[in-house]
Amino acid sequence: MIRLIFLGAPGTGKGTISSYLKEQHGFFHISSGDLFRFYAKEEKTALAEEIKSYINNGLYVPDELTNRTVADFYHKNQSQDKIIFDGYPRTLNQCEYIDEIIKFTHVILLQPTDWDMIINRLSLRRSCPQCKRIYNINSVDFKPKVANLCDLCKVELIHRKDDDPSVVSTRINVYNEQTKPVIEYYKKKNLLHVVDANKSFEELYKLVLEIVNK
């Protein structure tokens, strides 16, 4: 049984690698951002209404509610053999909470050596609003087959506002400051594996597979 956490700032490749692990190796993918959107849209529960009250008002979802949401979704899907957590945990409080529920097997930190490359990668990123598949319009391997259309859903791709270069630097700085304690937490538990996020996707994917298959 594999319980994997991906850590890394925006643009380091967490979502793309997670998608490939899901499609090619049967991993179940839990993304905190997607979870909030799912609960707010699909679920008809008190928990969903609570999440909706924050999202609809543009407010940050507090740790306590994030923890309950992830735990609720995990309990409904814990029979899955291989699960990826992407974007969670992001704070020390979240780490301590979820470690009482789940025994993680691997924590992979995608850490760039060149941040300018990451900022450029994000500025070229496009995503499908339906299936969440990620594309890069300047990459031979990751651009859509038909310009600006998702290969799977055939809907128009979007460029998220928070992927604009003017916003990306702030997102990266906030993420790095926020996750320093998380990185130290899993380092002390001897679960942390650090991978250079500036490597090509093929190299990154190969390294990740080597880690999870140990």
From Swiss-Prot:
Annotated residues for binding of ATP: 11-16, 125, 134-135, 199
Complex and partners: Monomer.
Family, as annotated: Belongs to the adenylate kinase family.
Functional summary from the UniProt entry: Catalyzes the reversible transfer of the terminal phosphate group between ATP and AMP. Plays an important role in cellular energy homeostasis and in adenine nucleotide metabolism.
Example of a GO cellular component annotation carried by this entry: cytoplasm
Superkingdom of the source species: Bacteria
Region described as NMP: 31-61
The name this protein goes by in its record: Adenylate kinase
GO molecular function terms attached to this record: adenylate kinase activity; ATP binding; zinc ion binding
Biological process terms in GO annotation: AMP salvage
Alphabetical keyword list: ATP-binding, Cytoplasm, Kinase, Metal-binding, Nucleotide biosynthesis, Nucleotide-binding, Transferase, Zinc
InterPro entries: Adenyl_kin_sub, Adenylat/UMP-CMP_kin, Adenylat_kinase_CS, Adenylate_kinase_lid-dom, P-loop_NTPase
Region ranges (LID): 124-163
SUPFAM superfamilies hit by this protein: P-loop containing nucleoside triphosphate hydrolases
Reaction equation(s) it catalyzes: AMP + ATP = 2 ADP
Location of this chain's protein in the cell: Cytoplasm
Pathway: Purine metabolism; AMP biosynthesis via salvage pathway; AMP from ADP: step 1/1
Main location: cytoplasm
Residues the record lists as binding Zn(2+): 128, 131, 150, 153
CDD domains from the UniProt entry: ADK
Binding, AMP: 32, 37, 59-61, 87-90, 94, 160, 171
UniProt remark on domains: Consists of three domains, a large central CORE domain and two small peripheral domains, NMPbind and LID, which undergo movements during catalysis. The LID domain closes over the site of phosphoryl transfer upon ATP binding. Assembling and dissambling the active center during each catalytic cycle provides an effective means to prevent ATP hydrolysis. Some bacteria have evolved a zinc-coordinating structure that stabilizes the LID domain.
Protein's gene: adk
Species name: Mycoplasmoides gallisepticum (strain R(low / passage 15 / clone 2))
Enzyme superclass (EC): transferase
EC number: 2.7.4.3
